[in-house]
């Protein structure tokens, strides 16, 4: 995966997670993140823990971070997937637990149109995260993920949130 132009956003995301030595990710599938789940299925370095609901993913990532000393990582879909993790994100922020939450988003041309399962993910998560991103350009995805891990694990450890527009995952 040397040339990012040859890979989908999902491939680039997985390479960035591998670069960060992530071995476990917690999550619940949904339409906006299915390309990531397809990529997870085709690799062998990352263990995915399927939870029953997104809130379980964020709390599992908290427990993983506390017990392992690593950054906890979770993956949720857009809309209700994001809103279901707000309590856990706030808990992680208040307890200084290093977590990176990755969510899907509707295609960038649909942002702001009340598309199916669209919500203002960055606005909703701004008060309960150390920093958040909305990645609309797949060429910035790897850089953003690496920066998220750096911020999550430096200073006061805390939570980072990144939302990937659906078209980035398919590029």
Where would I find each of the regions flagged by the language model?
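Single conserved hydrophobic/aromatic residue that forms the stacking wall/gate
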Residues: 161-171
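N-terminal alpha/beta PP-like core and its mobile active-site loop of ThDP/TPP-dependent enzymes
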Residues: 1-163
